[in-house]
Amino acid sequence: MASPQNARSFCSGVIANPLRGFPLLGGTALLSLAAILAGQELLRAQLKQLTPKISQTELWRVYRWSIDPQQRREAALLLVAKSKDSPLRRQRLLAGQGWGSSPLAAVALKLQAQNNKRLGGKSKANQLWESLLIRFPNAAATADAYYYLGRQQPELRKQLLKLQPAHPAALESAIELDASSNQHQGAIHLSRWGIHRPGTAELLRSACNAPFKDGPSAKERQDLAIGLAKLGDSKAALSCLEEQPAKPAAALAISQALLRGDKEQKLQAESLLLQLAQENPEAKESIEAANLLSEPLHPNAALLEALPPSLAERSPSVASARVRLQDGEKAESVLQRWPDNPASWQLQWDLAREALLKGQWREAKSVLKSIPTKKLPEPLAARQQFWIGFTAAKQGRNQEAKQIWEKLLKSHPSGYYTWRAQARLGQADLPELSGEQLSISNSKPELGEWTSIESGDELVDTLWRLGLTTDAWETWLNLRSETDLTSDTPNNRVVEGRLKMAVGDYWTGLSQLWRASLRLVGEDCQTRQFLHRSQHPYRFWPAIAKASRSNDIRPELLLAIAKQESRFSPGVKSPAGAVGLMQLMPETAAELSDGSLNKEELLNPQTNSKLGALYLTSLLKQWQGNPWLTVASYNAGPGAVTKWLTAELKEDPELWVERIPYPETRIYTKKVLGNLWSYLRIRSEELCKTRLKR
């Protein structure tokens, strides 16, 4: 038994060294903290990522019960994106979501401010704008705070123009700036960052008309001239320079505008381009000038000879033009030197098409095979493979043609050339396009689940994932003005095209996706199929389905026409005067409707699609259901098409369409029929063996 003294000695020994326990306690605390943090990370890793494809019920469950506050906020924002017509619900969902330093906090504060403004709470909205400005001065979401608070504090508007020059709020500020000032700073800003903003053209012209002494500087006039040229007003652009020489960028922009004009303007453009190339042979604009001078099928030999040798030598466009002038001589060396260049791709097709139309099958095949398929973008590779198969069939090598076409069908999404391959193989062709006997599905097809944007920026990707597409687009614009995202790469075109379509700009968005498809080389099957589906939206489906039912015509044909005519943009007006979703001439529309229509009626997608369907029905009846003649007539008119009727249409319709003398109608017919086949097949097409994911 220990004595009390020994016990006291033992206890005192322990108490006498209190520091001995601190490392143990501290280590235990640190281990506990590490375990908690690791556990939180593990739980977060196990949490389901929220996307628009998650059901409303599941979102509400996550919003209420998730252990992760960040996920609860994401659920709230996704629910907000789905509750655009319910400001009171949005207010409840957004309450308290502006916590922390995450970029999503800035977005939540912005949405709260906008919602309070919508509900009439101006004072509360201003408080939120001020909080947003203080906490997140550089966030894309804060642009609206600079704009609204800038009404009382003009200095904030000036800061906005510098910080986020491409943001819609900055562009609106620029317009309002010129309305209250005669210094034209808004016009100068718009010439650099927002030439397509409504009202910009008038502001740019006004700035250019200001006296040179008190108006824009010489450098600013160069920018204004570029803006006007990009808007198509070459005359105002030249006038804006006040007789000073155009810098390379301005000279190129003005020349591009002039090339779209009459014969005299085209000659003026050629002179400007040649001057640009001769005076600045090393400038990047001179490469494009050489491309433009080389572009026609029948280039001007004198202009090409006048180009600086150092510039001409490194230009595949100039080399291709010289091949054309020499009737194809030395084509092989050009195609082998620049197999990755669009100028070579175009030269290859021009020479192959010429040989095909002459029935020179061996020559056509040789030219078509001069660039490996793997070097070509998907649409051009499909064209190449179809015609190689065609030349084999024409030479009696039917088994070889069959193998080529079957391979084409396995590796390319549905389009014009896969349709023709299937027709040649006897596997499938177009169904009847009109008539009471049609079995028409009026249901909009489900084309797969939501897909990610993969922009390369985490915030843009997150906002897209949460259904906040406008915020994703504005954040992307902010990035474009800060980084090298202005580089016009195919991948950036895909991202920007999808964002544009998501915010309602189908005209630009579809164009960017198509241009991307003509530059992407070597993409995997899933990317190829995804890009193809992205280019075939079902916008205005209710109006198109109704027009289809009313006229017993396939809705896929209406979609195919609308995509090519207006890119699903009802406000578009052609230079010839055609308007609306289906691009009808007012005279044609009046005849179809038994009376004149005002502008608003003709721009209405429901009215326009109904009249377009009626016109197509009459054309199908006139041509006994022939799709080639119907589509060509929609573009060029039945009178012109009547002159092109030959036996070749039945025997080799692919060659018949290539003989159409109007280049616009030739391309139009192939594109619309390709669109039609895509829409007909898109419900069932599964090109890739693995499931499409992005």
Tell where the protein language model's regions lie, with residue ranges.
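Substrate-binding/active-site groove segments that recognize
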Residues: 575-597, 607-618, 639, 672
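Alpha-helical solenoid repeat scaffolds
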Residues: 3, 17, 23-547, 556-563, ...
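N-terminal Lys/Arg-rich, disordered targeting/topogenic segments
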Residues: 1-18
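Catalytic and substrate-binding regions of cell-wall glycan-acting enzymes that process beta-1,4-linked
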Residues: 630-685
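Short, contiguous acidic/charged loop-to-helix segments that flank catalytic cores in large enzymes
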Residues: 529-535, 572-576, 595-607, 621, ...
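Secretory-pathway/luminal and periplasmic proteins that interact with or process carbohydrate-rich
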Residues: 414-416, 430, 521-523, 567-573, ...
